[in-house]
A protein has these predicted regions:
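Alpha-helical segment proximal to the catalytic Tyr-Lys
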Residues: 131, 176-177, 251
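A conserved structural motif in NAD(P)-dependent oxidoreductases
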Residues: 215, 226-238
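Short, small/polar-rich loop/turn modules that mediate ligand/substrate recognition or access, typified
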Residues: 179, 184, 253-255
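Catalytic loop of short-chain dehydrogenase/reductase
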Residues: 142-166, 171-180, 192-193
Length: 268
């Protein structure tokens, strides 16, 4: 198993003066992304369906459900009125809430919610905030997709996987349109990342199967076909990739999908 990495101290001024919006930025990968931009000197705005226990200093939190059009409107209106727009937009909100049981267990409501949460939220917010980016002549947009868009798990997360596939495809088309106008668009597709939600899933698997936690973890990794690196990724690793793509260190990185999965996807 590859040892856990040590994360370098970022340049405290790398994102100074930048306005950054991270959706779903209070837990897991989103929380790590927000923290990474804050450590680089950015003004960070986050939004989620429920307010965190403590809003960090220098950070604006907007309580809104981005799976709804009205929730997107709340976020966009607040950001535009208070900040005049953003320089960096990271769409991280999303997840799976579908029941197990395969395709036959999925209702229209399950499919609609998955697409509203994982796909339409990004499309709607882009539509609301890109005009201000076009007006200022620059911007960076990063959509957080998933390797499930290429490696769908049909038992319980098929709607999520399909919505992420749509998000990745949409991102490519958007990049072709807005790239010539100064806005870079990229997609980051994580694999199995260690978060509090992932830890909870491992605990549930261990309890339901009557096995120890390590066996549950190994079983979960094997359900993905194994992770050649030998461990789940860390949220901070995803955050570092996002920060790099959004920074001036990556001026020609545009219209791409960047997979961070420890080698889970074995094909080129």
């Amino acid at each position: 198993m590859t040892p856990l990495p040590s994360h370098p101290n970022p340049d405290a001024n790398e994102f100074a003066g930048k306005r950054v919006l991270v959706t779903g930025g209070t837990k897991g990968i989103g929380e790590a992304i927000a923290a990474r931009f804050r450590s680089g000197g950015a003004t960070v705005i986050t939004c989620a369906r429920t307010a965190p226990g403590e809003v960090r200093s220098g950070e604006l939190f907007i309580e809104a459900d981005l799976s709804t059009a009205s929730g997107v409107e709340i976020v966009a209106t607040t950001v535009l009125s208070k900040f005049g727009g953003v320089d960096i937009l990271v769409h991280n909100v999303g997840g799976s809430a579908s029941p197990g049981g395969g395709f036959a267990a999925l209702s229209d409501a399950d499919w609609e919610f998955a697409f509203n949460w994982n796909f339409h939220s990004a499309v709607r917010l882009d539509r609301a905030l890109i005009p201000s980016m076009l007006e200022q002549g620059h911007g960076a947009i990063i959509h957080i997709s998933s390797i499930q868009r290429r490696l769908p798990l049909y038992e319980a997360t098929l709607p999520y996987a399909a919505a992420k596939a749509a998000l990745t495809n949409y991102s490519k088309g958007l990049s072709n349109e807005v790239g010539p106008k100064g806005i870079r668009v990229n997609t980051v597709s994580p694999g199995f990342i260690k978060t509090s939600a992932a830890d909870g899933l491992i605990d549930r698997i261990a309890k339901d199967a009557g096995i120890d936690r390590e066996s549950a973890l190994q079983g979960l990794m094997q359900s993905l076909g194994g992770i050649p690196l030998g461990r789940p990724g860390q949220a901070e690793e995803v955050a570092e990739l996002v920060a790099f793509l959004a920074s001036n260190r990556a001026p020609s990185m545009h219209g791409g999908e960047y997979v961070i999965d420890g080698g889970t996807i074995r094909t080129v």
